[in-house]
Regions:
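Active-site helix-to-loop segments that bind/position phosphate- or nucleotide-bearing substrates
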Residues: 1-168
Length: 168
C-alpha cells in the first residue's frame, strides 16, 4: 500500500514528512478496532502495553549497544540532554513492530488489558526472546539487536558501510 510508496520516497532528513504520514496511517490501521486510537505515552490502552513493551525493548537495545562498545547516550537522530538512551531510541526503531505484534496478540487473548496484570507483564517479558528474522535466519530478538548494534559499531569504525536490520 501507500506505506511502501512513502518508504521509497523518503529522502535524507525527510523534508516531505513521509515518516509522520506513515506513522499516522500505521496507528490508524494497526488498532483499527479501537475508534480514534491515538498513540501517546499518556493515552488510552493499549498505550500502556506499548509503553511497557517499548521500555523492555529499549533496555535490550541499550544492553546490546554497550556490549558492542557503544554509548547509548550519543544519539544519531534523537538528541535530548535529559535522555540517557538517545542511541538506543534510534536503534530500536526497526524492532518496534515486534512489540506491536505482541501487543496485538495480548489484546486478542485478553479481555481486559486496561491494567498491566501479572499475566500481561509475563507476556511482555518475552520480548527479548521473540522470534526475529535477521540475515535470513531466525534468532531471538536480543541476539538480533546484538547483530544490529555490532553492525553499527562496524559502520562507525569504517569496517562496513551498512547496518544489519531485522526483516519484517
Amino acid at each position: 500500500g501507500c506505506m511502501y510508496v512513502w518508504a521509497d520516497k523518503v529522502r535524507s532528513g525527510d523534508p516531505d514528512n513521509f515518516e509522520a504520514r506513515a506513522a499516522a496511517y500505521y496507528w490508524k490501521n494497526i488498532f483499527s478496532d479501537i475508534p480514534n486510537f491515538v498513540r501517546g505515552r499518556e493515552g488510552e490502552p493499549p498505550n500502556n502495553l506499548l509503553n511497557s513493551g517499548y521500555a523492555i525493548l529499549r533496555a535490550v537495545v541499550a544492553r546490546s549497544l554497550v556490549a558492542s562498545g557503544l554509548l547509548p547516550t550519543l544519539g544519531i537522530h534523537h538528541h535530548n540532554k535529559y535522555n540517557a538512551y538517545c542511541l538506543a531510541d534510534d536503534v530500536m526503531e526497526p524492532y518496534r513492530p515486534y512489540v506491536d505484534g505482541l501487543v496485538l496478540d495480548i489484546m486478542e487473548s485478553t479481555y481486559d488489558y486496561s491494567e498491566l496484570t501479572k499475566e500481561i507483564k509475563m507476556k511482555l517479558l518475552a520480548i527479548p526472546v521473540l522470534d526475529t528474522t535477521i540475515g535470513n535466519k531466525k534468532s531471538p530478538l536480543m541476539i538480533a539487536t546484538q547483530q544490529t548494534t555490532s553492525s553499527l559499531y562496524k559502520c562507525f569504525s569504517g569496517e562496513q558501510r551498512r547496518m544489519v536490520y531485522p526483516e519484517l
